[in-house]
Amino acid sequence: MKKVVIAIDSFKGCLPSVEAGKAAAEGIRSVYPECEVICLPIADGGEGMLDVLIMATNGQEVPISAHDPLMRWRNTYYGISENGETAFIEMASISGLPLVPPERRNPMLTTTYGTGEIIRDALERGCRNFIIGIGGSATNDAGLGMLQALGFRFSDKEGKEVGTGRGEVLIKVAHIDSTCVHPALNSCRFTVACDVQNPFYGPEGAAYVFAPQKGADREMVEALDAGLQNFAEVIRHTTGKDISHHPGAGAAGGMGGSLLAFLNAELKPGIQLMLEALDFSNKIKSADLII
């Protein structure tokens, strides 16, 4: 054999994609020492996505301190490609459910503010292309916190700011002010790994389907769904965009909807996004074996 491409996903909970690929490569080289072996660590947009993209682009980890779902400071990292143009962000690294103790899980009170802080940091470092994985969140704030970190301001009917973006404040939002939004956002491209098709609200929406997994009881679910309906109407009135029933708008507690409405994001299945980012179709050309 002259060329082998290794593209192995992680073995959940026991072996990362990178290590699995290295092991396979060592075995092949021990039998075919002259063979060209290309390792493409891979992920489906969930666990391991960030590290795979950093490695595939010869990028670097960027350490950052940001706010977790309960607005506590936490150290984490994201990635930037070697050319400095693309940022790789895993929402779960700062807004994820495992960061909230089981007894404090309440999507009425959690926020995506930290995810917005990471996006803002990457903007200030010059990134204009973003690849974001939004699985595993602890939130149902429809990305309100994220948007606040990027400069959006939300107020109620009396013109008073609603406070930190949490699920409980969605019902209060009546006005959106974008005058202080980070100026670089208009020139950015956002691609989001999203493997669900749920609408923004309703029986199949963010609150009813996902909020119970994040600690919500029946009363909370109903309140969150009402908040999402209100926010969707304010978005429609302000931007002219109706995200109510857009497939994927309900992902990550409504985060998908805000990414669509405010950042003009493109939602893609995680594996499709990863294969495109890795230039997979070109890498496997002329391969004798693909693992």
State where each predicted segment sits.
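Extreme N-terminal starter segment of soluble prokaryotic enzymes
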Residues: 1-5
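Glycine/serine-rich anion-binding loops at beta->alpha junctions
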Residues: 11-17, 127-147, 246-254
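A glycine- and small-aliphatic-rich helix-loop capping segment at beta-alpha/alpha-beta transitions
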Residues: 23-27, 56-57, 107, 143-156, ...
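Glycine-rich nucleotide/cofactor/substrate-binding loop typically near the N-terminus or early
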Residues: 24-99, 190-200, 206
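Glycine/threonine-rich beta-strand-loop-alpha-helix active-site module
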Residues: 109-113, 117-120, 124-131, 138-189
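Acidic, glycine-rich loop-and-beta core segments that form the ion-binding/anion-interacting portion
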Residues: 196, 201-241
